């Protein structure tokens, strides 16, 4: 993926012989560390966050390449990234900074950064399930000092864990990442939306059953696990087997054959909310504005409902994680890059992110001040009550395609009550088998 970079001058006075930032700039003047030096460079990034005021006063002229989703740089959402970087530069007058902005979605970080680590951005945003790939490619710095202290102080333990590997912290979180339920308040009461079966008995609901990020929620509800109870035990593998998993498959066979069930694909759920043919759908904060526009005063949003399996209520649980700011270890001035990452994940930056783009913050103090936003409540209730941290162990990559195909088989009628046990066992085997084996 080529970098789409727009250079923006952030300070008036820049030295003629300007040093490049941590990553390679378009001018090719980067002093990025070689592969042999990357370990020491990463360690420098770890300690830079606790640099003294004396180091802060050091005159530095540098270029930083910063990547974010295009929406963070768009004029119609207030140019959040440019605004924050400008404010950061103003607060550090001894650091003469030019920023080069590039477009990279958080979910694409592992593919884009690892393609050319030394040429990648100095500071970038990533989804936490990208973390193991970024670490393996030496594309992200281990953080330390004041940065780690602030991450631990400002976030829940679950958020801290989402950006940690083997006890080390690799990113500054700025939002949770999960999905929940939107519904039409004219169709369902607050009590009815607590149970999916109660809802579907009354009106149409849409669910992306063929999307592997969503389908696991039913199996986890009934005790199935992915890589152990906390998602970190790679040796445990995926446990979607036995009676507990077959019971879920039987439930899903009934669900997809219910005349009030709509398989959400290619935006059909949102379209259904707009035209009134669907009364509930499952998605994340990225659809909030569109759902609000579709439902108006009947806009409802809550954490996930329960489902009823063999007469017992079981809590659906979505995958959840975080989005965070990471630092490329190939830095000439890691203290500048780490300080910017810390700033972009600060309470002030999260507040601006929320006000400009509806990005729900994860800073606990800031969240305590937002008490009248149903979206914020739903996302954080989901994260805290009705989700599991999405595993980011290496073998999680074996899960996605089999789960997607199984959802398609359910919709196509290939999975039935008669073959539920057999098909579930095949699913479990596939999710525990590498595609290259």
Task: Locate the predicted segments by residue.
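Hinge/lid segment of periplasmic solute-binding proteins
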Residues: 56, 126-180, 191-192, 302-303, ...
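C-terminal motif of bacterial Sec signal peptides marking the signal peptidase cleavage site
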Residues: 18-21
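Extracytoplasmic/periplasmic solute-binding protein
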Residues: 170-174, 179, 196-238, 244, ...
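C-terminal capping/gating helix-and-loop segments adjacent to ligand/active sites or protein-protein/ligand interfaces
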Residues: 357-360, 376-432
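Extracytoplasmic/periplasmic substrate-recognition and gating elements
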Residues: 293-356
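Conserved N-terminal structural module of periplasmic/extracytoplasmic solute-binding proteins
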Residues: 7, 23-130, 429-437
